[in-house]
């Protein structure tokens, strides 16, 4: 169990929140998180890249010149991979890159990744009421009050994302906004700091606390 100090909108301490998630054993933790990360990145690939072999390139059906007597190297097609404009040898073809991982393993990897980042976790009170209208500047200022540097990559977790919060956050290039039930390993590991509302912490405990 991890206890985190809760900050209010102004950055002052206002309470405490706890997070209790089961994680992988130390000797297998990095391996299972790595597998989950590789799976996520592989599943994001479209796999639509395609090249043409010598059989698929247009033309090349006629032998360019006779086999013997010209003094030139023998050639059977102008679409040989050795020729400019020829086919591609062993080039990529459309394929499915997706990888399978058991649900229990995926959830264990996610919990392990999150608990490994508790040193970079900042818990704040739900602040949707402090943004009655979209205002990027107010959200950026609040992040600074919570101890985040302007150049740091931030993952902001909320139980529910209101329209004003979404509009306030979408123009900040270093900020990624996610619902607490949409956690993924890549975003957890990519961010420099993780900001979670108290509602998000409760939601994470509810969804992932097996």
From Swiss-Prot:
Name of the gene encoding the protein in the UniProt record: rplD
GO molecular function ontology, one term from the record: rRNA binding
Entry's Gene Ontology cellular component terms: ribonucleoprotein complex; ribosome
Annotated organism of origin: Thermosynechococcus vestitus (strain NIES-2133 / IAM M-273 / BP-1)
Region (Disordered): 56-77
UniProt cross-references to InterPro entries, sorted A to Z: Ribosomal_uL4, Ribosomal_uL4-like, Ribosomal_uL4_dom_sf
The protein's assembly and partners: Part of the 50S ribosomal subunit.
Protein function: One of the primary rRNA binding proteins, this protein initially binds near the 5'-end of the 23S rRNA. It is important during the early stages of 50S assembly. It makes multiple contacts with different domains of the 23S rRNA in the assembled 50S subunit and ribosome. Forms part of the polypeptide exit tunnel.
Record's protein name: Large ribosomal subunit protein uL4
Compositional bias of kind Basic residues: 60-71
Lineage, top ranks: Bacteria, Bacillati, Cyanobacteriota, Cyanophyceae, Acaryochloridales
Keyword annotations of the record: Ribonucleoprotein, Ribosomal protein, RNA-binding, rRNA-binding
């Amino acid at each position: 169990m991890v206890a985190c100090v809760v900050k209010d909108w102004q950055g002052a301490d206002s309470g405490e929140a706890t997070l209790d998630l089961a994680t992988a054993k130390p000797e297998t933790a990095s391996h299972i998180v790595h597998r989950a990360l590789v799976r996520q990145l592989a599943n994001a690939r479209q796999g639509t890249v395609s090249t043409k072999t010598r059989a698929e390139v247009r033309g090349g059906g006629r032998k360019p010149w006779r086999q013997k007597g010209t003094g030139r190297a023998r050639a059977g097609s102008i679409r040989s991979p050795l020729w400019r404009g020829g086919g591609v040898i062993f080039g990529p073809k459309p394929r499915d890159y997706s990888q399978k991982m058991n649900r229990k393993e995926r959830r264990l990897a996610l919990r392990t990744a999150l608990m490994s980042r508790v040193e970079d976790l900042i818990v704040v009170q739900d602040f949707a009421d402090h943004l009655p209208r979209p205002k990027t500047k107010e959200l950026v200022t609040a992040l600074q009050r919570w101890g985040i540097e302007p150049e740091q990559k931030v993952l902001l977790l909320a139980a529910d994302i209101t329209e004003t919060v979404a509009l306030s956050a979408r123009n900040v290039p270093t900020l990624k906004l996610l619902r607490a039930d949409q956690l993924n390993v890549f975003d957890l590991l990519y961010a420099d700091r993780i900001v979670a509302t108290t509602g998000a912490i409760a939601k994470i405990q509810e969804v992932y606390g097996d």
